[in-house]
Design a protein with these regions (language model features):
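N-terminal alpha/beta PP-like core and its mobile active-site loop of ThDP/TPP-dependent enzymes
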Residues: 2-298
Length: 298
């Protein structure tokens, strides 16, 4: 009886471990999410449209870029919603221009560059924005998530370049994550001490389903068990990218956390200065927040 109890306990433990492993795998492959959210393979929509919606809702009027294939859907979609797309001759110039717009308008500046060399060319300008405490959103294209580290076109570790320069460095993994990631990044850039943020958008979340399916999933009929397993994995990967992609989501700006002095603190400073015989006031950059657009100062 004791032996049977031990065997039963061991089997129950093994079953629990296997069940936990299966749940973890289902979560890893997005199977649980796909059960509850729709995938529309025939939809002509693409992730660039979601980027444009967020930027438009945040009052962005200008987008600076040097055009590239990885980011083309973003540029096309932004132009369609009325955002002026300014094509520069160098990626650093695009970020410098976004920095200038941010300082003059009081809104976040936006630059969009292609993967690899397009991103690396912006480093000097991003560092300048960091030192100037300018809220700038840098959107960089990237290789498909599935192909990273496998010799894809212009594939490098872009996030490591900006971790010491930007307040946030993040890579978006699915189409449904584009809107919440951009909203949070923009709010972070403008909150506290303003500064640049970097959002990486892999190419497979920016193009329509049928394009990604053709490029990633392939068109040949798989042969053998191994081929069928690989085909299933690729198809599931693509479906997870687009699951719930076009469900309605809030694109409005998140609250910006700007440190403000209380009335008591201001009054205490006034009293100190008024009593001083040789007053010296050291004013930090936070005193300029929230920013006032230049046209309102006329």
């Amino acid at each position: 009886m004791a032996l049977l109890a031990i065997i039963g306990t061991a089997c129950a433990g093994l079953a629990a471990v296997l069940a936990a492993a299966l749940v973890a795998l289902a979560y890893r492959f997005g199977l649980l999410y796909q059960l509850c959210h729709k995938v529309d393979p025939r939809s002509p929509r693409h992730g660039g449209e979601l980027v444009a919606e967020v930027l438009k809702a945040h009052g962005i009027r200008f987008l600076f870029t040097l055009a590239g294939g990885h980011i083309s859907p973003v540029l096309v979609a932004c132009e369609k919603v009325g955002i002026r797309v300014v094509d520069t001759r160098h990626e650093a110039t695009a970020v410098f221009a976004a920095d200038a717009v941010s300082r003059l308008s009081g809104r976040i500046g936006v630059a969009v560059v292609t993967a690899g060399p397009g991103v690396t060319n912006t480093v000097t300008a991003v560092k300048n924005a960091q030192m100037a405490e300018s809220p700038v959103l840098l959107i960089g294209g990237a290789a498909a998530s599935l192909q990273k580290g496998r010799g894809a076109l212009q594939d490098i570790d872009q996030l490591s370049l900006f971790r010491t320069l930007c307040k946030v460095c993040v890579s978006v993994r699915t189409v449904r994550d584009i809107i919440p990631t951009l909203r949070k990044a923009i709010a972070t850039a403008q909150s506290g001490t303003p500064g640049p943020v970097f959002v990486e958008l892999p190419i497979d979340i920016l193009y329509p389903f049928h394009v990604v399916e053709k490029e990633v999933g392939g068109t040949k009929t798989p042969r053998g068990l191994q081929g069928k397993v690989v085909q299933w994995y690729l198809q599931n990967y693509i479906r997870n990218l687009f699951a719930g992609a076009w469900e309605p989501r809030d694109v409005s700006p998140l609250p910006v956390q700007v440190p403000m002095a209380t009335e008591d603190e201001v009054q205490r400073c006034v009293e100190l200065v008024s009593r001083a015989t040789k007053p010296l006031v050291l004013v930090g950059s936070q005193a300029m927040l929230p920013p006032t657009p230049a046209e309102e100062l006329r």
